[in-house]
A protein has these predicted regions:
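Structural preference for solvent-exposed beta-strand-turn elements
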Residues: 1-195
Length: 195
């Protein structure tokens, strides 16, 4: 079973997370940031990952620490659940339409943390959510999952649609990348022999 449990406590956040890579897309998410909860529920559904996540953060300041630290914890969970990465497809990409927005994400579970982020979100907020925190979430994730993620906005004018399309596309790309490839069932998918 490719399952991880993460408990992460700092002076700013207290996070408990359980992730099943081979799930059915069932999630229970409570971070204190409603928009982030919505995005993670979409990610779980489209990636078919089971996700249980609670975060108690200093949202009386703002949502920055919560969003960043949830990204960190989710990245740690993927790293833990993937183990030695034997048999994974390694790569995944998805171009996804969300009304007028069109988002491409591409993943390489390479063991190297790299984020290529090219969203042009037109507003500073969606409801109470600071849209600049979208990038902070993904930075926290890639640095702790040790993978490469490229995000490209090919079209879009509605901030909510752009971010929602990104999380849906990201979920589907991660689903492809972590899937087991029968051709590599007992191998690391790299000529180096390690990821």
């Amino acid at each position: 079973m490719r399952i991880a449990e993460i408990k992460r406590t700092t002076a700013e956040t207290d996070i408990a997370l359980k992730l099943n890579l081979d799930g059915k897309g069932v999630s229970v998410v409570s971070t204190g940031c409603g928009f982030l909860d919505h995005m993670l529920t979409l990610f779980s559904k489209h990636g078919r990952f089971d996700l249980e996540l609670t975060c108690k953060g200093d949202t009386y300041v703002d949502d920055h620490h919560t969003v960043e630290d949830v990204g960190i914890a989710l990245g740690q969970a993927f790293s833990q659940a993937l183990g030695d990465k034997k048999g994974i497809c390694r790569y995944g990409d998805t171009t996804l339409a969300m009304d007028e927005s069109l988002i491409l994400t591409a993943v390489d579970i390479s063991g190297r943390a790299c984020l290529g982020y090219a969203l042009q979100i037109p507003t500073q907020k969606v409801g109470t959510f600071d849209t600049e925190l979208t990038e902070e979430f993904f930075l926290g994730f890639v640095r702790n999952a040790n993978l490469t993620l490229h995000i490209r906005q090919l079209a879009g004018s509605n901030s909510h649609h752009i971010i929602e399309g990104t999380f849906k596309s990201f979920g589907r790309s991660m689903k492809k990348a972590v899937a087991i490839d029968a051709a590599f069932a007992n191998e690391i998918p790299s000529t180096k022999g390690v990821l």
